[in-house]
Every structure is written in C-alpha cells, then in structure tokens.
Amino acid sequence: MRDNSTMHFLERLELDQMENDWTAPDEFPDLTNCKYIAIDLETRDPNLKKLGPGWTRNDGYVVGIAIAGGDFVGYYPIRHEAGGNLSEGRVMSWLKDQLNTPNIPKIMHNSMYDMGWLYASGVDVKGKIIDTMVAAPLVDENRFSYA
C-alpha cells in the first residue's frame, strides 16, 4: 500500500528544489496613470503572534513588495535572507511616488497591517483603499474561509 502523505511530501520537496526562472524586475515603471494599483507586502515580523504588529515597536521589516498596475506585475525583493535583493532605497523611493496618487484606488489584502508597515517605512499612501479581506465576506458571507 502506498503512503500518499509521504509521496506528497517527497513531491513537494522535489518541487521546492527545482530551479525557477523568476528574476526581480529590472524596471521601475510609472504606474501613476493606472486605473488601480494593487500592492502586497511580505514582512519579517518575528513577534507578531505574541506582541502584535512589529511596525508599532520597530520590530521586524519589509522583505519584499508585490505590486501591479495596468499591464505591469512585479515583485521587488529588498531584504530577503537568501539574497537577490534590489536597492531598498531605490525601491522605496519609487514606491513612494507610485502610492502618492490620490486619484488612484489602492487594492490590498489586510490593509491595516500593510499600511502600518508602509507608514513605518516612510511611505504615505494617498487615495481610496480597497481591502479584499473586508470585501470578500461582503460578496459571500456564507463561505467558511477566505484564507
């Protein structure tokens, strides 16, 4: 009899070890004329579960930024432990310009958390915030989970 859980683990391990062809963007496009800008942060927040968001205590940091607008989709790594990072100063300066756009709605998931990190990083987000974590149960209140 085959143990599917072991096979799943081995397949997952093999997939994790595969090389990928992803590379960090080499462009910093102007998104200030887009209809919407979607943004998601990846963070290192070691005491989140015990003490709450690290941005309140300067405990942790932004690791990378995923952003989309118009036809552009990109992920900007700035503090990954494994390397491959872009200049944090350059990325954050560009991000400030993109999010300082009061006429463009910003789409986020769990915006309260990401907005705290953006603010702590010196990025002032202007414009309407559309939070998919808030909107999802409004679309289907009977769904068990939105994770």
Regions found by a protein language model. Name each.
Residues 2-147:
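Conserved RNase H-like, two-metal-ion catalytic cores of nucleic-acid enzymes
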